[in-house]
Amino acid sequence: MAPKAEKKPAEKKPASEKPVEEKSKAEKAPAEKKPKAGKKLPKEAGAGGDKKKKMKKKSVETYKIYIFKVLKQVHPDIGISSKAMGIMNSFINDIFEKLAQEASKLARYNKKPTITSREIQTAVRLVLPGELAKHAVSEGTKAVTKFTSS
């Protein structure tokens, strides 16, 4: 056991000498890289800016693109203001939330763990009035059959 104790202090001495050498190398390295550091600073600042942009940018789900596409299908010559687009987007979010709540209630009433197309269809009939519900159901079934066939 005594030789093991001797090896440890012997290993520690070279280890303590190595950081001194590394410090001197570390001091020399930045001095040599000063001109390059000037070139790297914009890249690093840009990288830091990208990180900030990524942190600020949150994926907000909006329907603005789809609202605009439908508007151009119905009235190609008419535009829409950003305020009106925001109102339409919040309207669609509200309708979808009401449909989801109604569908979840229906699933709970029937003691089912999943919301199927049947619950969504019934929720549409309950939430939307009269003729609008009929059109929504027909368009929904058309979309579901198109999705399942492809």
Curated annotation (Swiss-Prot):
For the modification N,N-dimethylalanine, the affected residues are A2
- Which spans does this entry mark as compositional bias, Basic and acidic residues? 1-35
Originating organism: Arabidopsis thaliana (Mouse-ear cress)
Glycyl lysine isopeptide (Lys-Gly) (interchain with G-Cter in ubiquitin) cross-link position in this chain? K146
User: What is the name attached to this protein's record?
Assistant: Histone H2B.11
Q: Which GO terms describe its molecular function?
A: DNA binding; protein heterodimerization activity; structural constituent of chromatin
The source's superkingdom equals Eukaryota
Coarse class of the primary localization is nucleus
